[in-house]
Amino acid sequence: VSYDALVESVRLLEGAPPAGAARLSRRVRHLPLAVDRDGDVAATMFLRRGVSGVPELDVHTLELVDGVWSTLGGGGGPGDGATRGRPRLVDLGSPAVSSSGGGTARTSGSWLRRRRSGWIWWAELRVAEEVTALRVDARFLPVAAHGCAVVVWTRQPPQVTGLDASGSAVGPVLIRPAGSRHPGSIG
């Protein structure tokens, strides 16, 4: 990775805005695209310039322990979809499409720390042009102009609704976690 994932992720968690456009160059080698936080877990999404200038998408999972964020893992893949124009709702068929996702085991702790169990799950979303924000359970996530978003959770996939500029619901978004056979299910 050509950037410090922890430092850049913490910047997003502290309120730094994601990039408005997903454009890389020889000078701009990585861009923050999206962030979501659910209590003591978070996921961040970045676009980076890979070998030969090919865009790559990176998602990092983080956990807050004793007031300090740490990265646990994540995933990556082709990022060329992020550099394309946003699809229209009529073409996408939904306010957003869950294109990929994954999971990372939570910290097991040490004898000094309380043991945490379970997983941190995330879903990568491609959001329709008409959608300006997502309601993720009780959270509100603005969607940047490039239309990439990430959603994080620890138990059941959240209820996600696409919202337009007036705040009206455009419709539900089905979350398909990595390895799922059915929308909204894990495993």
Please name every model-derived segment.
Residues 21-30:
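A short, amphipathic edge element
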Residues 2-22, 41-114:
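A general sequence property marking short-to-moderate contiguous segments
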Residues 116-122, 128-187:
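Ser/Thr-rich low-complexity repeats and stalk/linker segments
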Residues 29-32, 45-49, 113-118, 127-132:
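Short loop/turn and low-complexity linker motifs enriched in small/turn-promoting residues
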Residues 35-42, 49-52, 62-68, 127-130, ...:
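Short, solvent-exposed coil/turn segments at beta-strand boundaries
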